[in-house]
From Swiss-Prot:
Binds 1 potassium ion per subunit. GO terms for biological process: tRNA methylation; tRNA wobble uridine modification. Mg(2+) binds at S235, T256. This is tRNA modification GTPase MnmE. Exhibits a very high intrinsic GTPase hydrolysis rate. Involved in the addition of a carboxymethylaminomethyl (cmnm) group at the wobble position (U34) of certain tRNAs, forming tRNA-cmnm(5)s(2)U34. Transmembrane segments: none annotated. InterPro entries: G_TrmE, GTP-bd, GTP-bd_TrmE_N, GTPase_MnmE, MnmE_dom2, MnmE_helical, P-loop_NTPase, Small_GTP-bd. It is found in: Cytoplasm. Homodimer. Heterotetramer of two MnmE and two MnmG subunits. The gene is mnmE. GO terms for molecular function: GTP binding; GTPase activity; metal ion binding. Keywords: Cytoplasm, GTP-binding, Hydrolase, Magnesium, Metal-binding, Nucleotide-binding, Potassium, tRNA processing. Residues 221-376 form the TrmE-type G domain. Its EC number is 3.6.-.-.
Length: 454
């Protein structure tokens, strides 16, 4: 990738629309754009940081192609810090492709996927967590996902990491000074104090790592399986959560024989709901296959709703088996059909219990709230700057492991030269999170997941 090239790409999604945008960036962006434009009022130049009305023309034939609005962002006050020109025309794919062709004919290069954002990163306008947030913002499916991505784009992860990283740098500097100036009047940091200072770095990183479980759910969504015996109201509950009649509901046991899936937003978090076949002993081949899929869905889910019939006076043996299995994982016991009567079947199991009526809607709001509590855990939904992808999580994990190695080394009186190796191993991953020292192949992999025009 040559940062001196001028690049072009369509910045709006594929397909027809009212407006389409073609973006040019680089040293020749303004010059090339002017060749394709006939500015209103006879203007000869694009004024920086302004929108201009113009006619789009073929530079060779002079043919008028469209009426457009052109925005010129002069460097360094642009997304990439290069000169950028954005041409907004009518959103015909043919017309947008023609604009790109005209630019390519003047020596401009087609942008690689994510190249505009990669230039913003390489030119120091954003760090790597902010670049990842651009992608997350584009791909967000809920308002809460968009809000989290916007916080990341504003530098929330970097701001949260910076004080911790600075403490580590300061500790390294003190230990280095003790070694470099051992013959001078420089005191060596006692091992006990060094261990305490490592703990001050370790604690916030451990908390950041803890919050990844919630950050991952925000980013990827949560899979929630609804399981239970036949006719306990699983499909009715599913329809209540989906807020429409998505699953077939009848009084006949075994109506649901295959998995029914739907994605809903609960508190801004995408929840992938799975309605399953009622679990029981069955000699029907089709139903047996559905029951096996139910058990697999329960095993694969992030959260399980075990639905039982609260109207039944005594709990069924299979209910207790499902409750016992669910107690070993993240689960909620739903005592349904409370409109017909209430008989608790929880029997003291250590999982949250919510009582509902899928028919009347009673308890459904409480169920949604309990699901969100289970998802949020102790990380807290209000705290900004949490990790949202595996790359960031693994780097924090690597840093924590190196800090623990440094602590162990100090406890057995290993020379500070060896301790410093562990501390540098803890610092490098923190630099990699923001992209301060990330290798080119990793950068190429990250930015290749972006769309062409971003």
């Amino acid at each position: 990738m040559n940062l001196d090239d001028t690049i072009v790409a369509i910045a709006t999604p594929p397909g027809r629309g009212g407006i389409g945008v073609v973006r040019l960036a680089g040293p020749e962006a303004r010059t090339v754009a002017l060749l394709m434009l006939r500015l209103a009022n006879g203007k000869a130049e694009l004024e920086a940081q302004r929108a201009h009305f113009a006619e789009l023309v073929d530079p060779e034939s002079g043919e008028r192609l469209d009426e457009v609005v052109v925005a010129y962002f002069a460097k360094p006050h642009s997304y990439t810090t290069d000169d950028i020109v954005e041409i907004s025309c009518h959103g015909s794919p043919v017309l947008l492709a023609r604009v790109v062709e005209l630019a390519l004919a003047k020596g401009v290069r087609m942008a690689d996927p994510g190249e505009f954002t990669m230039r913003a990163f390489l030119n120091g306008r954003i760090d790597l967590t902010q670049a990842e947030a651009v992608r997350d913002l584009i791909e967000s499916q809920t308002l809460y996902q968009a809000r989290v991505a916007a916080q990341q784009l504003g530098g929330s992860v970097s701001r949260r990491l910076q004080p911790t990283k600075q403490k580590l740098v300061n500790l390294i500097a003190v230990l280095e000074a003790g070694i470099d100036f051992a013959d001078d009047d420089v005191s060596v940091l006692p091992a006990k104090e060094a261990i305490a200072r490592i703990a001050e770095v370790h604690e916030p990183l451990a908390k950041l790592k803890e919050g990844f479980a919630f950050g991952k759910v925000v980013h990827e969504g949560l899979t929630l399986a609804i399981v239970g015996r036949p006719n306990v109201g699983k499909s009715s509950l599913f329809n209540r959560l989906v807020e429409r009649d998505r699953a077939i509901v009848t009084a006949i046991p075994g109506t649901t024989r295959d998995l029914v899936t739907e994605t809903v937003s609960l508190g801004g978090i995408p929840v992938h709901l799975v309605d399953t076949a009622g679990i029981r002993e069955s000699h029907d081949e089709a139903e047996s296959i559905g029951i096996q899929k139910s058990r697999e869905a329960m095993a694969d889910a992030d959260l399980v709703l075990v639905v039982v019939d609260a109207h039944a006076e005594t709990g069924h043996e299979l209910d207790h088996q499902l409750i016992s299995a669910a107690a070993e994982r993240s689960a909620i016991l739903v005592e349904n059909k409370i409109d017909l009567g209430r008989h608790s079947v929880a029997n003291g199991k250590s999982i949250p219990v919510v009582r509902t009526s899928a028919v009347s809607g009673e308890g459904i709001a409480e169920l949604r709230e309990q699901i969100l509590r289970m998802v949020s855990g102790e990380s807290g939904r209000e705290e900004s700057g949490f990790l949202t992808n595996i790359r960031q999580h693994q780097l924090v994990t690597d840093s924590l492991a190196a800090l623990e190695a440094a602590t162990n080394a100090l406890e057995v009186r290993v020379p500070h030269e060896m301790v410093l190796m562990d501390l540098y191993n803890a610092l490098r991953p923190l630099d990699d999170i923001t992209g301060a020292t990330t290798a080119d192949d990793i950068l190429n992999l990250i930015f290749s997941t972006f769309c062409i025009g971003k």
